[in-house]
């Protein structure tokens, strides 16, 4: 399961840009959310690796 730590997320949107099928921005907030937590899309790992504050993880 892919999760985002919203305390750590800075809203840079890199995960959304890299993997829009798994991540989206929360309306009205500068935070990302996971729209497909059980996705196996390769880009999800790219987004995890690219997160500048390491807010995304797999559990």
Swiss-Prot record:
GO terms for molecular function: 4 iron, 4 sulfur cluster binding; electron transfer activity; iron ion binding. InterPro entries: 3Fe4S_ferredoxin (IPR001080), 4Fe4S_Fe-S-bd (IPR017896), 4Fe4S_Fe_S_CS (IPR017900), Fe-S_cluster_ET (IPR051269). The keyword Magnesium does not apply. [4Fe-4S] cluster binds at residues 9, 12, 15, 51. Keywords: 4Fe-4S, Electron transport, Iron, Iron-sulfur, Metal-binding, Transport. The keyword Metal-binding applies. Ferredoxins are iron-sulfur proteins that transfer electrons in a wide variety of metabolic reactions. This is Ferredoxin-1. It comes from Desulfomicrobium norvegicum (strain DSM 1741 / NCIMB 8310) (Desulfovibrio baculatus (strain Norway 4)).
């Amino acid at each position: 399961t892919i999760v985002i730590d919203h305390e750590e997320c800075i809203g840079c949107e890199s995960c959304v840009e890299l993997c829009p099928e798994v991540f989206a921005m929360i309306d009205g907030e500068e935070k990302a959310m996971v729209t497909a937590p059980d996705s196996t899309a390769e880009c999800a790992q790219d987004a995890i690796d690219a997160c500048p504050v390491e807010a995304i993880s797999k559990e």
